[in-house]
Amino acid sequence: MIMRHAEADMPWGTSDFDRPLTPSGHRDAPRVGRWMLEHGVVPEMIVSSSALRTRQTCTWVCDELGEKAPTASLEDRLYNAPTRELLSVIGRTPETVHSLLVIAHYPAVQDAVLSLASSDSDYEATMGISSGFPPAGLAVLSTDKPWAALDGADAVLRFFIDR
């Protein structure tokens, strides 16, 4: 699963890295966690950008997942990362992990999903992501390939939740 952080504020004098979620972001992020529970797509591992808005998004998602939530790890390299870096982080996932959630930033989240999505992907989900990847958007992909072997069009995009 690949998720974009929820909507972030831009307070005067705050660095981009330290931007907090807006009230809307604080409402939308937990909805994604609830959707995961309702649809049985709870991650075994979560990797989040270390920026404040992604950490806050991750906290809300984990709060909704409750005791099913794994301990999230923060990855500095996901902040403003190009697509290849996001894919590299995914590729380093231990093979014992079967379900991963990455929480990162636009446009890398959109580009990574479109890079990974095969022609067998859900048409509407693919079209939705092609049109944009809004804050708190979530793409759910599946694959039989090992994480380290993912190099493009290797996964089936099953769902795209755009808030």
Predicted regions located by residue number:
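Active-site-proximal alpha-helix that buttresses catalytic centers in soluble enzyme cores
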Residues: 2-78, 118-122, 133-136
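Domain-level recognition of soluble alpha/beta enzyme cores
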Residues: 117-156, 160-162
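Hydrophobic packing residues within well-ordered alpha-helices of enzyme cores
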Residues: 57-61, 86, 112-113
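Glycine-rich phosphate-binding loop signature in dinucleotide/nucleotide-binding domains
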Residues: 39-41, 93-98
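A glycine-rich beta-strand to alpha-helix segment
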Residues: 98-119
